[in-house]
Amino acid sequence: MLSLRPYEFWFVTGSQHLYGEEALKQVEEHSRTIVNELNRDSVFPFPLVFKPIVTTPEEIRNICLEANASEQCAGVVTWMHTFSPAKMWIGGLLELRKPLLHLHTQFNRDIPWDSIDMDFMNLNQSAHGDREYGFIGARMGVARKVVVGHWEDPEVRERLAKWMRTAVAFAESRHLKVARFGDNMREVAVTEGDKVGAQIQFGWSINGYGIGDLVQSIRDVSEQSVNELLDEYAELYDIVPAGRQDGPVRESIREQARIELGLKAFLQDGNFTAFTTTFEDLHGMKQLPGLAVQRLMAEGYGFGGEGDWKTAALVRLMKVMADGKGTSFMEDYTYHFEPGNEMILGAHMLEVCPTIAATRPRIEVHPLSIGGKEDPARLVFDGGEGAAVNASLIDLGHRFRLIVNEVDAVKPEFDMLKLPVARILWKPRPSLRDSAEAWILAGGAHHTCFSFAVTAEQLEDFAEMTGIECVVINEHTSVSSFKNELRWNEVFWRGR
């Protein structure tokens, strides 16, 4: 997995001086305890940092400005232990540029029925202190995540942890660099888009490079490095018999190893974490990158085929949200319309990430009928089973829209022995018919990012952080209601 910065999250508790110094000491003690206990839980991918209790407008504004200035701070978690008059928060929230989570909890889980008195009531006021704070967020239109429940509840912790990963993806987005080798596939509409608009909206730097630059990087790779990488292939994957002995199949695999090493060197030199290729721009290359792309995706790089830079960036960011697990570039390829058992077979020409594999991948070499190059090596496998999401980011001209479909991946009943590509089979929610109708009405692309590890909630949170539209297709979706949602969204987003 590509390394990330040492991110952290600030835990800020609100109160006021009305209750006296002893009460504030208890608020601080409780807040420290919560932070320390949460940090002991391995579910959290990044540490929480306790910050002093804030009780005045000046303290609140200062902590928000400090969070903005910190390269390590990826987000702020707030909690009102007591009542904290929300007008005090206006100045700080106006300044805050980091993702914000409102943890609506309280220190004690249960009411102490036998001992409860007014001292306890005055100290433990989050039930209404957080509502006051929630009002000012709504009044100001602050983008924020609200998580409700006791801080020891595993579900609360899991939601907080997933939000952390999403906030880090947002932070990574602000300096994400995409390398485009060649242009978009000719005449294709959905892979186009406003690259300047994307940099303003998401922070992405998207630039094109001549295929000759990549070819030179590939030529610079040493034979020793290729041999070492081939040894690694033999440890990790099954290889067809012809690929284990000298000959054209072995040489095809060697060529993908060269491409992988040259491509990785180019990306590392330019600090790129996402890239695109296209089969129409391969001058000087012997093969379309296949195995090379699959392995780079497994390391955490984002990828988009046919010049699809939006999906490449989305794959990278969803890799961050997923901690590198179970996430891949994908394409809806063909349908199975058996009544009562409708499914979608997802694949691509070559480039499906092995992190979604259910079986040990196998390196094979087969002809590729487009691109006019030599037969490329690729990893072939069946995808895993379980709940997952498919996500597509599109450019509507005046805004970006993120479309998410919750799906259930299933084990194939047949081996598909003649299909020479990695593939995965899924049943979309609520059904193939309704999901496809809704997807098409929303303008969803044929390229997606598929993930077992990322949730629809995380993607909704990311859309909230970046200020874009998000629509979700799931088991509750009806096409008629979805049409109305799109109409309402059109009015809302055009009015912003």
Curated annotation (Swiss-Prot):
Taxonomic superkingdom: Bacteria
Associated pathway: Carbohydrate degradation; L-arabinose degradation via L-ribulose; D-xylulose 5-phosphate from L-arabinose (bacterial route): step 1/3
Q: Which GO terms describe its molecular function?
A: L-arabinose isomerase activity; manganese ion binding
Q: Which GO terms describe its cellular component?
A: cytosol
Q: Which major enzyme category is it?
A: isomerase
Keyword Repeat (UniProt) = no
Family, as annotated: Belongs to the arabinose isomerase family.
Q: What does this protein do?
A: Catalyzes the conversion of L-arabinose to L-ribulose.
According to UniProt, the name of this protein is L-arabinose isomerase
Q: Which gene encodes it?
A: araA
